[in-house]
Amino acid sequence: MKLKINSQGLKGHLKVPGDKSISHRSIMFGSIAKGKTIIHDILRGEDVLSTIEAFRALGVEIEDDGQVITVHGQGISKLKEPEKALDMGNSGTSTRLLSGILAGLPFETTLFGDDSLSKRPMDRVATPLQMMGAEIVGQTDKVKLPMTIKGSAHLKAIDYVLPVASAQVKSAVIFAALQAEGLTKVVEKEKTRSHTEEMLVQFGGEIKVSDKTSLVPGGQKLMGQEVTVPGDISSAAFWLVAGLVVENSELILENVGINETRTGILEVIQAMGGQLEILEQDEVAKAATLKVKASQLKGTEISGDLIPRLIDELPIIALLATQAEGKTIIRDAAELKVKETDRIAVVADALNSMGANIEPTDDGMIIQGGTKLHAPENAINTLGDHRIGMMVAIAALLVENGEIELERAEAIQTSYPSFFDDLEKLSENL
């Protein structure tokens, strides 16, 4: 598709789609809890639909009336062996978290996905689940999809130190621990997003969290709840950056989730001198209205324990850095290589083709800022990565003339089906 270029500014209010991480987990907890779970403002993107279809295949009744989703949970022990292999689409979250649930169920399930998901390593989740007693077989020593899980009704609790900072692996172990005999201990090296722990408590479960250590007793019973999903800060990130770098822009984003394990991008914007206001903060819902204006920005360093708090936002942060004066260094982010694409290489290639000056490194990027972007000579392919597609669409707004062709733009449906509609709306408000 041809992208809109040469924006004269973006103006207006926007409510971004529901948080993808919370949407996945609300379906999962609703499916393993007993009783009715009602979910408001869920993200209806392709990844979350993969989770919904997987639990329907496991025997859970899930209704969608277009307004709310209702999950009729009967408890985890009532999940049934699916009649065929489960299609995870492009969703790493669906695959890894569901693996933790399947690990404790006494039947065999095969999971498969698209080409991108089939390249992603699942050994990181298979290893602790095998230690607990599940049998898991996948492709190559990295346990890639298709992967078959033979669960055990007698999982054993473990003490496990996560080798990588991964909320998905942590969550898989927590889901398995709910079904295990004994007390499971999970230790993180870097703190990652905490939605699983918080939602477990919301559904009546027990977990003790102290800094980077979580203790989960086994044999827990959960009860259905009512959940309202806040806006996704990872989706809001594209508009935050657009509002900062496109001249004559001023944007207000309503009801954005600001869980402290996800707000790294807000700290980066402030460190770079961006005009950002946090308004109407709801401490209970962990949501706020965010306002940004076009700003003069300066380079910064992004590393260490900040990385897990903005890992999904790093592609659009790279674009932000191209428009800041001076150098921005991103390090400790090797995890980017095993996302939907190798995001270090793909981000650098895409933005460099538009005139940016980005040097990819083993664990991040060195970005020389203050560069003027131009139309690339060739089309840019998302390679099936939704965040690459949206990053390029925002970058295109900075290009004064020429044409930018985005191939496989449909990947954006994964997390933000209304992205181009929202872009049009904000462009028309001038």
Curated annotation (Swiss-Prot):
GO terms for cellular component: cytoplasm. The active site is at residue 312. Keywords: Amino-acid biosynthesis, Aromatic amino acid biosynthesis, Cytoplasm, Transferase. This is 3-phosphoshikimate 1-carboxyvinyltransferase. Its main location: cytoplasm. Its EC number is 2.5.1.19. Belongs to the EPSP synthase family. It catalyses: 3-phosphoshikimate + phosphoenolpyruvate = 5-O-(1-carboxyvinyl)-3-phosphoshikimate + phosphate. It comes from the Bacteria. GO terms for biological process: amino acid biosynthetic process; aromatic amino acid family biosynthetic process; chorismate biosynthetic process.
